[in-house]
Design a protein with these regions (language model features):
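Glycine-rich phosphate-binding active-site loops on the catalytic face of alpha/beta enzymes
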Residues: 67-82, 245-257, 296-314, 344-378
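Catalytic beta/alpha-barrel core
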Residues: 73-77, 103-104, 124-126, 164-165, ...
């Protein structure tokens, strides 16, 4: 047997190797349906997931992407308590009704109230007694000119003619009550005057401004959180679930591993009611193993990211388009969606990833330069950049991602074997601006393919192209005089 016949088992193609073939279409880009699944039970309005990277997704990013209709995965390079706090921030950022509002006891002081307002970034707090009955409400206006920090809340709160509603009131009626009485916060009480929730004018306004937001059944923004495979994985998961996380992502460099599969089984036993997504993988065989172990979603991508060096350092990987297609074939009929993670440079790559069988795409470098990313802002040669690093970079591994690459027992930094780099990306403005262009490109691609929704896009066909075809696809034989918001020359 020859080496090629015996050892080469597949052709590996990535996004630049193919183009989608246009088809007869009765679909206009503006009419396509972009809703999809993140995991078995979590639906998205747009197929975009921000990566669990410490220069990409914390609460600010997760809030922003959820408001656009996607979901963010908060990274794990922080303490359990801090990651849970980040999740809680997202869950409190927007509500239909806040079911567990921050409250203060009637015997508390002005200082206590101000501390709570500062901690939770809120402008008003319901005041309750020991039985949780509503006795008043205190707002910034009540405290603005108060100098005695030890004064009891009872003496400064609003306690007369408090406007309330009951849990059965619909949002349209609530909006009318808020406008009629010119108030911003409406306590929700039961028949015994016990506080059961709080509705704010700000949340109603946000819901109207962002009708496509990705929300749970209680009207709260959805958020996922990443965990590794460590001794404290279950402790971290419990804290995240208690904080309100909608899904957990077991995030490793090699998801087709005995240790990952065992941890997944253990996690599903402890937390049967929450969706658990597992990655990363690159083969159909890996997908089948994870689904059999209980995965509610899988993440595909071994080395395609711009800051990942796994393929060079370890010599391992599968070009991303082929990996997505192979996993998609294996998952057919299971009801388990896949996330195409990495290798995306243009909106056209998103269309290709979804056409190959993806249900959503995970984006890192595309959003790392946005205002909402936690990366450090840098000025270089008069231009603004933000830091962006792989979770396999030395810098990230020092901060907690060693376990992702199965090196958690290595304490000496010099003995770590990195599989990523630290870099910088141009500042890109707000996440909304980036997502707007990505969604626009996706809609255009679906229109060309005649695909009214993502499921139909899975039926699209590809043509393989040469290097000359790649060059022809990009602007050529000209000097660009005005940059487009959705294109830059490949480096």
């Amino acid at each position: 047997m020859s080496f090629i016949a015996d050892k080469i088992v597949m052709d590996g193609l990535t996004y630049d190797d193919v183009l989608l073939i246009p088809a007869y279409s009765e679909v206009l880009p503006k009419t396509v349906e972009l809703s999809t699944k993140f995991s078995r039970n979590i639906e998205l309005k747009i197929p975009f997931v921000t990566a669990a990277m410490d220069t990409v997704t914390e609460a600010k990013m997760a809030i922003a992407i959820a408001r656009e209709g996607g979901i963010g995965v908060i990274h794990k390079n922080m303490s359990i308590e801090e990651q849970a706090r980040q999740v809680a921030i997202v869950k409190r950022a927007e509500n239909g009704m806040i079911y567990d509002p921050v409250t203060i006891k009637r015997g508390s002081t002005v200082a206590d109230a101000l501390a709570l307002m500062a901690e939770y970034k809120i402008g008003g707090i319901p005041v309750v007694d020991d039985e949780r009955c509503l006795v008043g409400i205190v707002t910034n206006r009540d405290l603005r000119f108060e100098k005695d920090m030890d004064k009891r809340i009872d003496e400064v709160m609003t306690k007369e003619n408090i406007i309330t509603t009951n849990p059965t009131t619909d949002m349209e009626a609530v909006s009318q009550i808020l406008q009629e009485h010119r108030i911003e916060k409406l306590p929700v009480v039961d028949k015994d005057n016990k506080l059961v929730g709080l509705i704010t004018y700000k949340d109603i306004t946000k819901a109207k401004d962002k009708p496509m937001a990705c929300k749970d059944s209680k009207g709260r923004l959805r958020v996922a959180a990443g965990v590794g495979v460590t001794n404290d994985t279950l402790d971290r998961m419990k804290a995240l679930v208690d904080a309100g996380a909608d899904a957990i992502v077991i995030d490793t460099a090699h998801g087709h591993s005995m240790y990952v599969i065992e941890k997944l089984k253990e996690a599903k036993k402890c937390f049967p009611d929450i969706d658990i997504v597992v990655g990363n993988i690159a083969t159909g065989e890996a997908a089948k193993a994870l689904v059999e172990a209980g995965a509610d979603g899988v993440k595909v991508g071994l080395g395609p990211g711009s800051i990942c060096t796994t393929r060079v350092v370890a010599g391992v990987g599968v070009p991303q388009l082929s990996a997505v297609y192979d996993v998609a074939k294996a998952l057919k009929g299971t009801g388990i969606p896949l996330i195409a993670d990495g290798g995306l440079r243009y909106s056209g790559d998103v269309v290709k990833a979804l056409a190959a069988g993806g249900y959503s795409v995970m984006i890192g470098s595309l959003v790392a330069g946005t205002e909402e990313s936690p990366g450090e802002t840098i000025i270089f040669n008069g231009r603004k950049f933000k830091s962006y690093r792989g979770m396999g970079s030395l810098e990230a591994m020092e901060h907690g991602s060693k376990d992702r690459y199965f090196q958690s027992s290595t304490s000496d930094v010099k003995k770590l074997v990195p599989e990523g780099i630290a870099a910088r990306v141009p500042y890109k403005g707000t996440l909304y601006e980036v997502i707007y262009q990505l969604v626009g490109g996706l809609r255009a691609g679906m229109g060309y393919c005649g695909a009214a929704n993502i499921e139909k896009l899975h039926d699209a066909k590809f043509t393989r192209i040469t290097n000359a075809g790649v060059l022809e696809s990009h602007p050529h034989d000209v000097s660009i005089t005005s940059e487009a918001p959705n294109y830059s020359r490949p480096e």
